[in-house]
Amino acid sequence: NSQKTFRVGFLPVTCHLTCPVTDWINKSMTGKGFFFPVRFSGWPELKEAFLADNLQATFILAPMAMALRQQGIPLKIVYLGHRDGTALMGHKDSDIHSFKDLKDKTIAVPNRFSNQRLIIYKGLKDNGMKLEDVKLLELPPPDMPAALQSKAVDAVTSGEPFMAQTEMDGYSRVLYQAKELWPNFISCVLAVHERVIQEQPEVVQQLVDGIARSGKWLDADIEHRMEASQDVAQQYYHQDPRLLRFVLSKPPDRVTYSNLMLAQKDFEEIEALALEAGILEGPIPFQEYTDTSFSEKTQGIEPYQWNPGK
């Protein structure tokens, strides 16, 4: 019954990959899943579905979850989605090679409340610049490759595999990987309605455990990543599998999924930048928007013991 009633939102980005991978592994191993993954194309639709109670949980931008809690939405962050897995891309024919070259240029970001926006803010700040020195344009990640190819924007940044798509198709180059600007970068988290935590804590724990196990499974063997790329891209993302294969292997640590327990210092760094950038209205206590009890129980959890190739 939980599969029918426990709906989890995700976007077709690698920041959310553990959501479909958990479902895929469980269905492959046991013939059934224990939650229903719901795919969205953009942040506005996903956010509205969560606020309308059409989702029990969702992968969501970390600053967006913090801001929603600040606005009175009863949610809790219970786990991380990933580490790293974001790049800033410029057109290969452009004269942009550093943040200094971005002055007066147009940069596409996924959302006002995205950590990609904070990466831009941090990079500008580290180079003695301000947000006002560039033009930020909000675009759904799937629309970014076409915008960069047509030179409608000068640079783009979002979760993968859309940055890799621009690289593979030959019209872009990497300006910066997220880890160069912000080591152990976090974009997205898993958020759950507080009511759901109170009413179905066992399903929330099962979900967090599954995500932890699938994340470690992905990081354990490059062949696991290649197998997941093929099936998840087709069945859940509706994308060319070569995109996920590229992102998950070149190099393998381009995005990682093992170190996903909640740590206060990570969110204090996000909060500090979000306050400076004007995303948050004011400070918000870590305990107010997180429930660390679920992630704490994943300490030492083993990856799924499954080899799809055998």
Predicted regions, residues:
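Short amphipathic alpha-helical segments at helix boundaries and their inter-helical linkers
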Residues: S150-V153, P251-K265, E296-Y304
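Hydrophobic alpha-helix position signal
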Residues: L68, L124, T166, V232-Q234, ...
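N-terminal hydrophobic or amphipathic helices and topogenic motifs
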Residues: N1-R39, E268-K310
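Short, glycine-/small- and polar/acidic-enriched structural segments
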Residues: N1-K130, K135-E138, D154-E160, Y171-Y176, ...
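Amphipathic, soluble alpha/beta structural segments
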Residues: I60-A67, L80-A87, D231-Q234, R242-L244, ...
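Pocket-lining segment of extracytoplasmic ligand-binding domains
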Residues: P63-M64, S94, L137, P142-Y237
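Secondary-structure end/capping motifs
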Residues: Q198-G282
